[in-house]
Amino acid sequence: MALVKTKPTSPGRRSMVKVVNKDLHKGAPHAPLLEKQFQKSGRNNNGHITTRHKGGGHKHHYRVVDFKRNDKDGIPARVERLEYDPNRSANIALVLFADGERRYIIATKGMVAGQPLMNGSEAPIKAGNNLPIRNIPVGTTINNVEMLPGKGSQIARAAGGSAVLLAREGLYAQVRLRSGEVRRVHIECRATIGEVGNEEHSLRVIGKAGATRWRGIRPTVRGVVMNPVDHPHGGGEGKTAAGRDPVSPWGTPAKGYRTRSNKRTDSMIVQKRHKR
């Protein structure tokens, strides 16, 4: 894996920096693990925009990734190949189990074709193996962590993501996330050893607006250049400031305002990610 800076043959390529991984499969993905994916463009069933700045972009199939990895315990497997996935920042790995079934999983850092893998409580503590947290030594770096047993991984799934197992107390373990938050999870929740691969993803430079449109992301217009009917910051004669603290188009404070309302899981957070 390497960062490649392109030659300035055009304004768009002048600042472009790409992540090149020669180990990725160059052919078509595994067809039985593909599903159709329809463009929603950020609209709901009424056609109203519920998520702004979405629309357009290149068509692509959804790769069915196994986030649970709980029904192949004890069955040896090996990595057939690594693949690019347009639906996420991390790369994925096509895994062949000894019973002949193939599945996609999130590729961990250092994973290569031919690498043996194992799921279950008897799996060795090696990068890429998936097992319950009760069987993982304290201090181990983990990724793809479940929040509820059997629900599938929800924490540390993006490129370069990881968490650290800090402690185990009774039925719960403490996990420190990249944000600094320390969270309690049940010891029967599963996790994968190691970090998520493609850690250089955050260092890429897209280079031009069109490449962002290819990804299905539409432009973000500043509220201060809108009309008063469209945004609280809008209006004024000539180039003017917002005239108030930054807010969203609906008047909610935009910077530093906490919006978390899930009180049901507050007891699972040992240390908040906020410093104060």
From Swiss-Prot:
GO terms for molecular function: rRNA binding; structural constituent of ribosome; transferase activity. It holds the Pfam family Ribosomal_L2. GO terms for biological process: cytoplasmic translation. Residues 38-59, 225-276 are annotated as: Disordered. Residues 39-49 have a biased composition (Polar residues). It comes from the Bacteria. Part of the 50S ribosomal subunit. Forms a bridge to the 30S subunit in the 70S ribosome. One of the primary rRNA binding proteins. Required for association of the 30S and 50S subunits to form the 70S ribosome, for tRNA binding and peptide bond formation. It has been suggested to have peptidyltransferase activity; this is somewhat controversial. Makes several contacts with the 16S rRNA in the 70S ribosome. This is Large ribosomal subunit protein uL2. It comes from Cupriavidus necator (strain ATCC 17699 / DSM 428 / KCTC 22496 / NCIMB 10442 / H16 / Stanier 337).
